[in-house]
């Protein structure tokens, strides 16, 4: 039973795009913490994840703080932002990941690792599928090597539908985060595997015209700003600080 859960990573673990009723973002890590808090007294949760962070900064900045905070459970998901960059260096990225995970495990901290899913049916990321496949494969290997809990989304097709994704087509929707949390809880051994087959009514597929309209809106609202930041060497996380930098209690949110 864990009493001090710390989340590390980028926008996925920060919770984009799952709005919290009280403001900011909730996300799968908050949802996981909310559930764990009901199973033990004096449960505490912190979250150091910041959107846009690449592997180097996650490991160099977040891991040392994590070690000082002395959690008994850490979740980490990282590497996608590296895979999206032109200067993708897979060997260096994985070596850095292994270093960070080994530091946590050396302190006997339980680690939950997320291996990202197959973007084959998600057109916006299909172009980097080979990179993400490599990242997934190596992440799974690290989880086994260091005896970590693992959520492996690669073989799961349940998240292919648009309903699980936000308008930016990169981050999960609130529903997507809900099922990601269920996957995490299953990996931790405190929930069943029903997340693999979401039994929810799916909306009808949009018409061709609606899809083209959404494509244009996505291009203007998300793709262009993202490209501009890349050209300018900026990150969406510049100037931001962690949303929960210290351990504190967390209460379940009524969905």
Language-model-derived ranges and their functions:
Residues 18-23, 88-91, 126-130, 166-167:
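Short glycine-enriched, charge-decorated loop/helix-capping segments at active-site entrances
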Residues 36-40, 100-112, 138-150, 187:
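A structural motif corresponding to the C-terminal end of an alpha-helix
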Residues 90-98, 129-136:
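Charged helix-capping and loop-helix junction motifs
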Residues 1-51, 63-70:
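Serine-esterase "nucleophile elbow" of acetyl-processing enzymes
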Residues 77, 81, 103-133, 154-161:
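Active-site segments of SGNH/GDSL-like serine hydrolases
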Residues 1, 145, 168-171, 175-255:
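Conserved catalytic region of serine esterases and O-acyltransferases that act on ester linkages
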